Amino acid sequence: MAAQVASGVGNLNLNSEDGAAAKNISAQGSPENEARESDGEYDDDQGAPELGNTTAAKKKKKKTKKKKKGTSKVQTEPPRVILSSLFPNNQYPEGEIIEYQNENAYRTTNEEKRHLDRMNNDFLAEYRYAAEVHRQVRQYSQKAIKPGQTLTEIAEGIEESVRALTGYPGLEEGDNLRGGIAFPTGVNLNHCAAHYTPNAGNKMVLQYEDVMKVDFGVHINGRIVDSAFTIAFDPVYDNLLAAVKDATNTGIKQAGIDVRMSDIGAAIQEAMESYEVEIKGTSYPVKAIRNLNGHTIGRYEIHGGKNGKSVPIVKGGDQTKMEEGEVYAIETFGSTGRGYVRDDMETSHYAKIPDAPNVPLRLSSAKNLLNVITKNFGTLPFCRRYLDRLGQDKYLLGLNNLVANGIVDAYPPLCDVKGSYTAQFEHTILLRPNVKEVISRGDDY
């Protein structure tokens, strides 16, 4: 969902409850041990029976075992263990810490303390919680996604894992506003760069020769972590992916307090367009998609709201500066096509407009649907599958009416020319007073 338009497994079963444990995470006790302890199977106080109690001891069939000390809870495959049980003290891993370059390295002591006091409480804990959920879900997904799966299976598997790890299933009123999915899972194939998720009945299947951008978000109390990666099975696309990953990392390196957006865009474009990719004997320069941008992230507002800023991925233009305390999605898109996207295909993504006008609605279906959207999503983006999941039906007329009245925005898929291939990588960064934190960084990208 993160893309902002410039103005102008075999069989994957991510829903399966089976699977071996994947990732050891420091915590106290294992899930199995805790369950046994609660049933009384383990008892440290039990020793050898006294002489007068030998009969009672013989009758006791449960085998006495010592508690295992130091064992760690683990995440399952697919991910289903709520993250708070793996980190009982709410001490979630920090992201990659990067010092500011040159003149941005020095911040006055009092200013730093004031801001750190504000950031080192719920703000950072909630962001790091969301980021760790994103890492665990995507790292499993990158291993599990295979050709032959439907896009619906892939998207819903990721979403089910996010709901499980955050502990917010999203079926009760207001549940999704407390935490969970921040926007619909984008599974964008080939020339489609962004904003595509399957609607109900979609039968599209992932093929070996496809290039798929997977873009999903996690939030805790409106603190949104927005990160994306690209999957390609055919090594012919390796240079395309390398170009975009390099460009995103270049943007992250350049970003910082008082840095101009135009300078970041120029560095991103230079990095990306130094690559080319050969497909079926033809060489294609990798072009930065000039009308897609990174962006600020606000609380419950993926594009930062009315005061949001854009981070270009080409040179020229905006002289606006980044500021301390801001949160950014640094994302880049590369293409073998024209390097320009347009609206295409069936719309699936929608979002209620912050401070939308108070328009009298004549259609009762529109009124009812607006109430559902407000109570379940607020200003977080949603898709038609999410409305289906809440039991809504025959809502398209009302939804289109909300769009027509300027209350809800529609976000159609954004595509380059057919036959081209696009790639995306994205991270969320926090501009802390003395360092920037790449909150979504992982071992994978």
Curated annotation (Swiss-Prot):
A Pfam family annotated for this UniProt entry: Peptidase_M24
Keyword Disulfide bond: no
Compositionally biased region (Basic residues): 57-71
Single GO cellular component term: cytoplasm
Binding site for substrate: H195, H303
Chain ranges passing through the membrane: none
Principal EC category: hydrolase
Stretches the record annotates as Disordered: 1-80
Function: Cotranslationally removes the N-terminal methionine from nascent proteins. The N-terminal methionine is often cleaved when the second residue in the primary sequence is small and uncharged (Met-Ala-, Cys, Gly, Pro, Ser, Thr, or Val).
Protein name per Swiss-Prot or TrEMBL: Methionine aminopeptidase 2
Higher taxonomy: Eukaryota, Fungi, Dikarya, Ascomycota, Pezizomycotina
